[in-house]
Amino acid sequence: MPKKRASNGRNKKGRGHVKPVRCVNCSKSIPKDKAIKRMAIRNIVEAAAVRDLSEASVYPEYALPKTYNKLHYCVSCAIHARIVRVRSREDRKNRAPPQRPRFNRENKVSPADAAKKAL
């Protein structure tokens, strides 16, 4: 039977067993190397309260702390939430990360990036 992908959907290579992690969406237990991992970096303070805090702060130019969460998704939840997409056989061989869209000040995609995407 043909193999669908060279990595078997994992990043194990030589390790017999990998500890499981839980999917943040459905709590399914999946091997840590198979899970789709994303970092969620957010400000602890919401955008509406940032100005109030900076005015009330004793320290000038105080950098507000951020939360750093590593999110683990199972394959089915990652596809359902469009974190990863299903790709064709030829595109599956491409290991490079996809191009990230560049936004200008009005949160619009720049024309140069839109032209690259159209090709």
Swiss-Prot record:
Pfam families: Ribosomal_S26e. Its main location: cytoplasm. InterPro entries: Ribosomal_eS26, Ribosomal_eS26_CS, Ribosomal_eS26_sf. Residues 103-119 have a biased composition (Basic and acidic residues). It comes from the Eukaryota. One of its GO terms (cellular component) is 90S preribosome. GO terms for molecular function: mRNA binding; structural constituent of ribosome. It is found in: Cytoplasm. GO terms for biological process: cytoplasmic translation; maturation of LSU-rRNA from tricistronic rRNA transcript (SSU-rRNA, 5.8S rRNA, LSU-rRNA); ribosomal subunit export from nucleus; ribosome assembly. Keywords: Cytoplasm, Ribonucleoprotein, Ribosomal protein. Residues 1-20, 88-119 are annotated as: Disordered. Component of the ribosome, a large ribonucleoprotein complex responsible for the synthesis of proteins in the cell. The small ribosomal subunit (SSU) binds messenger RNAs (mRNAs) and translates the encoded message by selecting cognate aminoacyl-transfer RNA (tRNA) molecules. The large subunit (LSU) contains the ribosomal catalytic site termed the peptidyl transferase center (PTC), which catalyzes the formation of peptide bonds, thereby polymerizing the amino acids delivered by tRNAs into a polypeptide chain. PANTHER family: 40S RIBOSOMAL PROTEIN S26. Present with 16300 molecules/cell in log phase SD medium. There are 2 genes for eS26 in yeast. Component of the small ribosomal subunit (SSU). Mature yeast ribosomes consist of a small (40S) and a large (60S) subunit. The 40S small subunit contains 1 molecule of ribosomal RNA (18S rRNA) and 33 different proteins (encoded by 57 genes). The large 60S subunit contains 3 rRNA molecules (25S, 5.8S and 5S rRNA) and 46 different proteins (encoded by 81 genes). eS26 interacts with eS1 forming part of the mRNA exit tunnel. eS26 interacts with TSR2. Belongs to the eukaryotic ribosomal protein eS26 family. This is Small ribosomal subunit protein eS26A. It comes from Saccharomyces cerevisiae (strain ATCC 204508 / S288c) (Baker's yeast). The gene is RPS26A.
